[in-house]
């Protein structure tokens, strides 16, 4: 049988990851086409039922803020994954996006050193993919 890990809100954690992506993409006030593509590509890879998909499409129309996303983590591992999902959704080229990632890391209680490691990993993956 399939056991899906749960977020702190009792929903499947994979939904929390997409909510983090949506929230980060909206940090500058709108979800751009590249950000939307990343989010939809991620949703397409998940094995979601119709209710879960509807939940996520509602989340796109009413994105959560960093505080709401911070409340979804059960422990440091999930917190790190939520931060990384948010970071994957955006290219933080706007001060509001950078501020969002900082606020999210603080709310999730992800240590600065771990954030730096995750950021380095992201940059290495982007370099390898280029």
Label each PLM-derived region with a short phrase:
Residues 1-22, 34-130:
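Small-residue-enriched hydrophobic alpha-helices in membranes
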Residues 29:
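Acidic, glycine-anchored loop motifs typical of Ca2+
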């Amino acid at each position: 049988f399939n056991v899906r890990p749960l977020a702190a809100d009792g929903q499947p954690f994979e939904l929390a990851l997409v909510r983090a992506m949506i929230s980060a993409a909206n940090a500058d006030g709108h979800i751009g086409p590249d950000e939307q593509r990343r989010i939809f590509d991620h949703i397409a890879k998940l094995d979601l039922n119709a209710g879960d998909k509807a939940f996520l499409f509602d989340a796109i129309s009413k994105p959560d803020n960093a505080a709401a996303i911070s409340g979804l983590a059960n422990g440091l591992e999930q917190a790190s994954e939520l931060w990384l999902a948010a970071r994957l959704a955006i290219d933080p080229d706007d001060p509001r996006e950078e501020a969002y990632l900082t606020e999210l890391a603080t709310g999730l209680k992800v240590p600065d050193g771990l954030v730096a490691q995750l950021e380095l990993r992201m940059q290495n993956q982007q370099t390898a993919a280029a």
